Amino acid sequence: MEYKLWALLLLIVDRDGLRKPRPNTQGCVLDAGAHDGSTAVMLVNALRRLDLQVHALEPLARNAEVATRRARDVSNLYVYRLGLGEVDGATAHYPAEYDGRKSSIHLQIARFREQDNAGNASYLLTTIDAMFNDDTDRTLVLAHLDLEGGEAAALRGANRTLKRDRPVLTVETFPQSMAKWHREVMALLEAHDYQVFTVDEKVGWPPDGRNHVAVPREDRHLRYILDSFFAFSLRRRAP
């Protein structure tokens, strides 16, 4: 996870900005696009005093194996070889040779090259609503979505959960090089009445990639935390 985004999430946690779980439910964090599981471990350790579970999803077989090994000795961390989408139980495909490459950039490129959205390796998709439906007794308090282009689909599969739990969300988009996808993600967040704050920090490739933190517009405390963070960042940059 990028430095500034991590600092902002730690500030939100330190200032008690995450929603409290609903009565008789377990508070949860979703790390979707978990890669090798290192960010999921960081989240578990940072959130330990809140007794939150971290559910890490990673579609690539090799990455999921590494993440699963990392999780063996970490309490409250659960790893699944799954992708996120808008239809629970659907199947996605990719060339098997991607499992021989550590970098997730190949999946990111594949989102925009139709010929790479097929292959002899596959993974199942689930939805946020399926993972956090009422029968699970879970409350989603934070979702970190690093889905290499799949953020919009994940948000479309989260309507009930976003309405019920109002979690903090982080998403990654490319406002210039992948403008249509960026606008779609922003429109979905607006439809759920989320205010979006953009972290001025380059992520991934192409170089216009940015992280965004979205918080429920009605949550004044969260908005104050983020307004303060970005005001301080601007003051530090001023000559």
Where in this protein do the model-derived segments appear?
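Phosphate/nucleotide-binding beta-alpha loop and adjacent structural elements of enzyme active sites
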Residues: M1-P239
